């Protein structure tokens, strides 16, 4: 079998709820190289974070934990690996393992997710364009 490791399972910290349309990044920030962190995209994509917040509250979890748990629930061969350099982030990430979903919940979330019109090019897509 082949495993699948999703790129950026916590969206470069976006699900940490510390960015919004007023966020500005230093010239050295990795966020400057990603379309989805432009002010316009952050404003438009707020609906995704709002949806993650609603569901994370339902699951008594953080949006980051919800994001990781949802990815884990998709298929047994999907293995999200969030990069972290801080112990408290690792502990938060591990909390995703305690979250479960019913098939009905997964279907409901998927329908809500598909109704959101996201802005910005995904990181790997912009990398491919440079080739």
Tell me what each language-model feature is:
Residues 27-54, 58, 73-77, 91-131:
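Terminal-tail/helix-coil boundary detector
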